[in-house]
Regions:
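Mid-to-C-terminal alpha-helical segments outside catalytic/metal-binding sites
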Residues: 2-4, 10-62, 90-91, 212-213, ...
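Flexible, glycine- and charge-enriched loops at secondary-structure boundaries
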Residues: 41, 78-85, 178, 182, ...
């Protein structure tokens, strides 16, 4: 089985975050992000042996890790973002099995050569912030990166970007994951639907957290003049932080063949899904395998 959405920071990446004088940075085990309340990190959450043991106990044989686009590292000065991307990938690849790594990239000056090198070194694909993909000019601005993925058949993981000032201290701790993160994913889902597949026909893309339940709004989109209809076999969603009710609802819209298993550990644990054996096999084994196979359009569903 494959979990396509976890976060585990290797030592080199932790050191790089601690070396920063400005947010986003780590102060010891205290995460400081621009305009957001500080967040205390449990060191054991980034212990590779502990994480691997937990995965093995649940039957996960491959754990796909990313730094988390919600840190906002992609929008730093391009040279700084590139250094952090290198520190991330060096450390993540050094972990070895059962871990596999998503690359990160700066978005102010997208570097196609650096992404191509990351894929050559073993990165699964690219983690991209949902708020970046949702921007009106995103497909044009991100074209250097998306073209690399499209040509290689390598996957794009769309993950929430920073909550920023919406993570107000007066709000409960669950506010950012439930409100700004979900709304970003919802917007990114429909931004991709509006021309993404036409421009990048071979790019497999997976939206975290069921794309903020964006797929459930197809009826409304069509009622307002849209033309969403046929399911795109290369546009996937993963299940992190959702249970049977939401997953079943999305399956009714998209079918089971584009639903992938993801947990968002260490921030969520996998909710047991009350689905049939065939559906669980598709979600946990077949679909992640197809997503992460280069050129999944050539892999039978």
């Amino acid at each position: 089985m494959t979990d396509i959405h976890q976060h585990l920071w290797p030592p080199a990446f932790i050191d790089a975050l601690r070396a920063r004088a400005e947010a986003p940075r780590l102060d010891g085990w205290r995460l400081v992000l621009p305009d957001e309340r500080p967040y205390s990190i449990d060191p054991s959450d980034h212990d590779p042996a502990r994480r691997a043991a937990a995965a093995a106990a649940e039957g996960d044989e491959r754990i796909c890790i990313s730094p988390a686009a919600s840190l906002g590292l992609d929008r730093l000065d391009p040279a700084v973002a590139a250094e952090l991307a290198e520190a991330w990938l060096d450390g993540a690849l050094a972990l070895g099995a059962p871990f596999a790594a998503w690359a990160m990239a700066g978005v102010l000056e997208p570097d196609a050569a650096a992404l191509r090198d990351a894929l050559d070194r073993g990165a699964l694909g690219l983690e991209l912030a949902a708020d970046v993909l949702a921007a009106p000019d995103a497909l044009e601005r991100l074209a250097p990166l998306l073209e690399v993925l499209d040509n290689e058949g390598a996957a794009l993981l769309v993950h929430p970007g920073p909550a920023g000032a919406q993570d107000d201290p007066g709000r409960p701790g669950w506010w950012a994951p439930v409100v700004p993160y979900v709304s970003q994913l919802h917007a990114a889902w429909w931004a991709w639907a509006d021309g993404g597949r036409e421009r990048f026909p071979d790019l497999p893309v997976c939206f975290a957290a069921l794309a903020g339940l964006g797929p459930l709004h197809g009826e409304r989109q069509r009622a307002r003049g849209g033309d969403s209809g046929a399911v795109d076999p290369l546009t996937f969603v993963e299940t992190s932080c959702y249970g049977t009710l939401a997953v079943d609802a999305v399956i009714r819209v998209l079918g089971v063949d584009v639903i992938c298993h993801g947990t968002d550990r260490p921030y969520c644990d996998a909710a047991p899904l009350a689905l049939g054996e065939a559906a669980l096999n598709a979600i946990k084994i077949r679909n992640p395998g197809r997503l992460l196979a280069r050129h999944p359009d050539k892999v039978p569903t």
